Amino acid sequence: MPFCKDFLWGGATAANQIEGGWQEGGKGPSEADMLSAGTHTTPRQITPDTEPGLTYPNRTASDFYHHYKKDIALMGEMGFKAYRMSIAWSRIFPTGEETEPNPAGLQFYDDVFDELKAHGIEPIVTLSHYEMPLHLVNKYNGWASREVIALFERYARTVIAHFKGKVRYYLTFNEINCGTLPLGNYMSLGIRNEGTRDFLHQVDDVQVRYQALHHQLVASACTVLAGHELDPEAKIGNMIAMMPVYPLTCNPKDMLEFQQNWRQFNWYCADVQCRGAYPYYAQSFWEKNGIHLEITNEDRETLRRGTVDFFSLSYYQTNCVTVDPNAAQASGNLLGGAKNPYLESSQWGWQVDPDGLRYTLNEIESRYDLPIIIVENGLGARDALEADGSIHDPYRIDYLQRHIRAMKQAVEEDGVDLFGYTTWGCIDLVSASTGEMAKRYGFIYVDCDDQGHGSFKRYKKDSFDWYRKVIETNGEEL
């Protein structure tokens, strides 16, 4: 059967990558405000304070804070049914420890949600998308402290209660499974171990990281329970960065490597959030890595009861794994792996694999039997603004066409229960991995360079009209 008639077509962004206004409306600094600009080859720097000579792109980003009415009008012109966005925690609780929320922060999002409603667009709200209040990073080393669970629950309860009737869909933590990687220390968990500066090569303490991830999983379950209590109409989902892998060869040892890699990155957090308990393989992983988690009986009961209502995911690429140390490697700037000889790569070295999306959706469906929504998918590429204001991006249209076609096959031929699709970076924004504006994903071009200079004027790319037609025909015309 085709996509359901109320399928949620739209786009996605994150507050720290699009909003700007980092010191306006009572907002406090977040962890993202201390990330410098980088490039494909130069890692971003994590600084304890503002340092001369460095650019901090998330502070201005795409200036959605001052352009939201225009931006939402453009989404409406494309026919968006949904807009997946995040609320900046430090705009609601500037340090994370206030007992009362910042009224100006709540008002800003009230205005955004009212504008979305005026254009018939459903908000899908991520409560935490790599933007922990900086104060909590400095005082508690982020999620390493159990104290942060209660602070996050207060924030989540405030948001869900205040926006009752305006927001029906929430995601707890963006790409929570990035906490299974050393890369996730700062970005996902707010951990800044001593000596950490290079964003891509952080000082790692696996014990601290997995304890912090446990605290985050408990907070996610607390949020689900609070959401159901405060707003019975609300649906609370998880958000997993799906990074499928294939065994490079039919060597049984490659198959075992594939199995272990897949479940530890893709399933470890999802099993807890969807099934309510740690999976059987977690204990052996902890023992092999000298991890001794503090898990209380109350934690176990919270996890058991606080399972999510739906499964959301990001999907960009796949990799291969092998036990062969001499295998050629993919050149991805964020997560690498063995090079797949059957796949092409993006300008940033990410291996493009539409069929992998179909495979992934089927794996999720068969494992969890929950409604699924894709909340991130897209192609980061360099775009050229022509003298006449046009931007020709056939490469983006091609990428999205192929992924939507694979998504359709998963629904129509395989029976996957998919209820929405929001492309990543529908409006150009700051790249999380590199801090660049040059790595553009949007249907809407923002006139801003990597140093934050430009008019911030918005221009429609060729893909703008193409996606409008896709939505208008409910995915029939690609």
Model segments located where?
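Active-site region of glycoside hydrolase catalytic domains
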Residues: 1-46, 51-52, 76, 95-97, ...
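Short, flexible active-site loop motifs that bind/organize anionic cofactors or intermediates
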Residues: 58, 65, 96-99, 347
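Active-site mouth loops of central-metabolism enzymes
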Residues: 53-66, 144-146
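Glycine-rich, proline-tolerant flexible connector loops at the mouths of alpha/beta enzymes
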Residues: 87-101
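Catalytic domains of carbohydrate-active enzymes, especially glycoside hydrolases
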Residues: 63, 67-88, 305-310
